[in-house]
Amino acid sequence: LSLRKHVVKTIDDRYSSKREYSPTMQKYVGYYQLAISPAYLSHFYEKFMKKYHKLDNVTGISVGTLGTALNSDFDDDEPYNREDARTFVKRALEYIAGSGDQALDVMVDGGNVYTWKYVRHILNAPLDSSRYIRSSYSVPFLGVVLHGYMNFAGTPLNMEGDVEYAKLK
């Protein structure tokens, strides 16, 4: 991994990173995780998958953030917007899912619609309304659409704000 070549840059030319905030502890608990430029996703996953397929009895893989995160890259030499990132993510998911003897069950987090073609499992799917001001009722649209098509789950109960309401979903 080359910091200069493979890591996403922000618009002010800094390297982009992700941190995880814990509302319980009221501080950042995750280390700085560097975001890989979308153009290099396929490159990294191709190298990884060659080694991964050599493992015995492997039938699936979780590629969490490929289901939700689209990173722009403001590198001066190779700038990419979120639409470019979506194309790169789809290409990576197609390679990861494989076909024939190399086919894997893929699991993602969030599961944006462009991932549905390649995945079998979605975690943290939004099972409720978007809560837009013009919404009169909460309709579990995503659950209705995906039911029977793939396995999906919403937010874990211990992460919900209202456990009783979450049980009803």
Model-derived regions, located:
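Aromatic- and carboxylate-enriched substrate-binding clefts and catalytic-loop regions
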Residues: 1-169
